[in-house]
């Protein structure tokens, strides 16, 4: 939701206002920064803020997926004609009403694409929860699957059974 609004503002603003192209490239350049570079500062920052739990991981996922989602939404908005917005403005709709009643429903295919890509990425992510979440009681499913592997051996029967069960919700 936040990413679609940001993509709308940046996508429509790039044609009209000069500085929006810089903002767009600044946000999209975040896709080129690997998590391994950001890992240690994020651990320190989340610990200082006291969000080394599920909430902190959710906030980080919102931030990490913003560049890709803004890229997708702003690219999709180039295919939606501005005449739709102009017609809504002539009918007396505000910019906010135009977005929610005209543009947002037209972006349903992109909402589905963003939801699928984000869900797959967060479901399969091991590193972010492993580094950020403190305490043994807070585990995601991929973190719980790490318990089947140890330094001295692996319980393959239980490990592969858990992998199959973890695959079912994604299908």
Where are these regions (language model features)?
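A structural signal for multi-pass alpha-helical bundles of membrane permease subunits
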Residues: 1-171
